Design a protein with these regions (language model features):
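Flexible, solvent-exposed loop/hinge segments and secondary-structure transition points
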Residues: 2-210
Length: 210
């Protein structure tokens, strides 16, 4: 028993030391990896903004603002695009939780007149070969006379976008109607945010000219 009593404290001390060491290592790893991950995410967003917004010469990422449209519970991040000091449009980071596999995040660009310039899918977990075809499908010309390529759509005349199965004009991805509805939900959310920017857009344009 004497040997056991002398060994137990040593074991506890050893385990405690190991826990402290592991915690320290994890803290260092977290610190080392957090910055690169954040930087990679920022680069991806900057590239998406450039891909979907009208041509600009400012830094939309540095001028971003949070906007809570009427009827929504979550604010969306809005990136103003300016050219020669004039506001030319916005890139809006939108999302939906209605995907077949949950969350889909989309960057949607609009020009100052409310036309949808382009979109870029930032994140999704949709089924390969089905819902994962969102980027390709909604950049292709429709074969049915409906809407498929959403680029250039006058959203003032077209919104809200809905699939043909729901009485709308947008072609759903074959065998992936849920993913199609989810994508349009994200686009419509971005449009509602754009629509709520009227006063903000005027202020931004005025500030740009000063």
């Amino acid at each position: 028993m004497k040997k056991l009593s002398s060994t137990l404290p040593n074991m506890l001390l050893s385990l405690g030391g190991i826990c402290v060491l592991v915690s320290g290592i994890l803290a260092v790893v977290n610190k080392v990896t957090t910055a690169p991950i954040a930087e990679a995410e920022m680069r991806a967003k900057v590239e998406a903004i450039r891909a979907v917004a009208p041509a600009f010469d400012n830094n939309p990422f540095a001028e971003k603002l949070m906007v809570l449209p009427e009827g929504e519970t979550d604010s969306l991040t809005v990136y103003p695009a300016k050219k020669g000091g004039s506001l030319v449009g916005f890139a809006i980071e939108s999302y939906t939780q209605k995907g077949f596999s949950g969350l889909i995040r989309v960057m949607v660009g609009f020009d100052a007149e409310g036309r949808l310039v382009d979109f870029s899918v930032l994140q999704h977990s949709e089924s390969p070969g089905l819902g994962s075809r969102i980027p390709e499908w909604y950049h292709e010309k429709s074969e049915t006379g409906g809407i498929r390529d959403v680029r250039g759509l006058d959203m003032k005349a077209s919104a809200p976008l809905t699939v043909s199965k729901d009485g709308g004009k947008v072609d759903a991805i074959t065998a992936a109607t849920i993913s199609s509805r989810a994508f349009l939900d994200a686009v419509n959310r971005a449009w509602r945010t754009f629509s709520s920017l009227e006063g903000t857009a005027t202020a931004l344009a005025t500030n740009s000219q000063e």
